[in-house]
Design a protein with these regions (language model features):
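Short, Lys/Arg-enriched, disordered terminal segments
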Residues: 1-3, 229-230
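Core catalytic region of metal-dependent phosphoesterases/phosphodiesterases
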Residues: 2, 15-115, 176-186, 210-218
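Structural motif
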Residues: 3, 46, 118-119, 159-161, ...
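Active-site metal-binding loops of divalent metal-dependent hydrolases
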Residues: 7-11, 51-54, 82-84, 111, ...
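Conserved catalytic scaffold of divalent metal-dependent phosphoesterases
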Residues: 9-14, 40, 88-174, 181
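Conserved beta-sheet core of the metallophosphoesterase superfamily
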Residues: 77, 168-230
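Short secondary-structure transition/capping segments
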Residues: 81, 91-99, 125-133, 194-213
Length: 230
């Protein structure tokens, strides 16, 4: 039994015009993902999908992508990315997944999931650069969601592992509000996606910074091979 993760699947079975195959490093990405998933992940495993899961604009349009994920082995825990336009209220999403028979997909949102002695925690996050007032409102909300998730794991006596969509650090841009939460709760590992392309990957923190181990898990960076966490 193992824990895996990968971000940015960008599935488009319900919106084929949104395929990422036109970009360098993304050729046949859905087929490669399926092959690598089947070779590495078993039914006894859990895998965290760190946002940008489907290009569907609604739950209905994203349904083929959920069914694709459902058929793959393992328990799946999903969190929101900036391109998950289908995302709606937790009640609606859980009801939709239940109606579609997607029983292996769980949603990480203001909560945690236990994995052994660990708590799987996380949220989408937000951009690192100073923005408009609206950006500040979104950032404050994301900071609260991250802390709520981590606190729920700590209260359960678990060691939190954090998964996010946006990177807390990118190039010379630091999201100090997010980092403060990671430092306060002494988070050892933070996994994130969002960043695409070799030149951008080179600007990411992929080592230990201020006692936090940062891991880039964007699909193209991992060559669509799920990364083992535990």
């Amino acid at each position: 039994m193992s824990l895996f993760t990968i971000g940015d699947l960008h599935l488009c079975l319900g919106a084929p015009d949104k395929t990422m195959s036109v970009f360098t490093g993304w050729q046949n990405y859905q087929e490669r993902l399926e092959k690598n998933w089947l070779e590495n992940v078993t039914e006894d495993d859990t895998i965290v999908l760190a946002g940008d899961i489907s290009w569907g604009m609604s739950l209905q349009q994203a349904a083929p992508d959920f069914h694709f994920i459902e058929k793959l082995p393992g328990q799946k825990i999903i969190l929101k990315g900036n391109h998950d336009y289908w995302w709606t209220t937790l009640k609606k999403m859980e009801g939709f997944l239940a109606d579609e028979g997607c029983s292996s997909i769980k949603i990480l949102h203001n909560n945690h999931y236990q994995y052994g002695d660990y708590g799987i925690c996380g949220t989408r996050g937000w951009v690192n650069m100073p923005g408009e007032v609206q950006d500040e409102k979104v950032l404050r909300r994301e900071v609260q969601r991250l802390e709520t998730s981590i606190q729920s794991a700590v209260k359960a006596g678990l060691e939190p592992i954090v998964f996010m969509h946006y990177p807390p650090i990118f190039a010379t841009n630091f999201n100090y509000d997010i980092l403060e939460i990671l430092y306060r709760y002494k988070i050892k590992d933070c996994y994130y996606g969002h960043v695409h392309g070799r030149s951008a990957h080179e600007l990411c923190v992929t080592n230990t910074y201020d006692d936090v181990n940062f891991h880039l898990i964007a699909g193209d960076y991992l060559q669509f091979i799920p990364q083992k966490v535990i």
